Amino acid sequence: MKIALLSRSRKLYSSRRLIEAAEERGHEIQVIDVLRAYMNITSHKPSIHYKGEELEGFDVVIPRIGASVTFYGASVLRQFEMMGVYPLNESVAITRSRDKLRSLQLLSRKGIGMPVTGYASKPDDIKDVIKMVGGAPLVVKLLEGTQGIGVVLAETQKAAESVIEGFMGVKANILVQEYIKEANGADIRCFVIGGKVVASMKRQAPNGEFRSNLHRGGSAEVIRITPEERSTAVSAAKIMGLNVAGVDLLRSNHGPVVMEVNSSPGLRGIETATGKDIAGMIIEYIEKSGKVGKTKTRGKG
């Protein structure tokens, strides 16, 4: 197969591993920087150009699109879909999962466990927003934040009011969520491929920190998940429409709660913690499922 890997750099761990896995299995793979690709939006003959040449003959496209380039990256991916190239994750699923509020609304509609969450822009009554999610301590999140950036734990009522007022002052849209104290600063990353959890790890926040993101100094170790956690992760990925996803869960007193569904999960942490060849599993999934023209939306999303 001829595979297009949408990535800003072939030197990134996840990109490097996918290239290795594809080439080991005899596939041709080309790394394409989405920001350097440009498109011809023409009726009946959509095309993508890169470095002065038209991109042709691809069977599969693997999107590794960073959050900061979601809009343009999804546009390039959508163009591939319109050309009949099979996407590992479809553009509509990626944009859906990147919208934190939309994701939570979809998950709640299907009855997936989640922390009690409020959404606000300029609430008239901040105290009522805080009361709505059960009071302090609580977590305030920027809607557009990633890797733990823009996430604040407010431990008291006064702190919560100050944080919310501060975000409002810079005209930021925020999520206000209950703090799952019983999780003890740990979350579970479930790696889902093709409707199955193929690996899972526990990420633990360092002392004095509540965010367990590896980018923030958290540690990771392999963990055995429960059947309910497995089912929740698979369902969350399916609701988002993602073939490959990193589903982040917390263990709460009322069962597993989904914190985020990541459409472009990193491979370094999960491969290091579990010792599994996740990149190889992704390529194997593509070999079984990646048929030209087999795109549910054909770029209509």
From Swiss-Prot:
Residues noted as binding Mg(2+) 2 in the record, renumbered to the chain: E260, N262
Top EC category: ligase
UniProt binding sites for Mn(2+) 2: E260, N262
Matching InterPro entries: ATP-grasp, ATP-grasp_RimK-type, ATP_grasp_subdomain_1, RimK, Rimk_N, Rp_bS6_RimK/Lys_biosynth_LsyX
Cofactor note: Binds 2 magnesium or manganese ions per subunit.
Molecular function terms, GO-annotated: ATP binding; metal ion binding; ribosomal S6-glutamic acid ligase activity
E.C. no: 6.3.2.-
Domain ATP-grasp span(s) in chain numbering: 104-287
Cofactor(s) listed: Mg(2+); Mn(2+)
Coiled-coil annotated spans: none
One matching Pfam family: RimK
Cellular component terms per the entry's GO annotation: cytoplasm
Keyword annotations from UniProtKB, A to Z: ATP-binding, Ligase, Magnesium, Manganese, Metal-binding, Nucleotide-binding, Protein biosynthesis
Domain of life: Archaea
Residues reported in the UniProt entry to bind Mg(2+) 1: D248, E260
Protein name: Probable alpha-L-glutamate ligase
Native species: Methanococcoides burtonii (strain DSM 6242 / NBRC 107633 / OCM 468 / ACE-M)
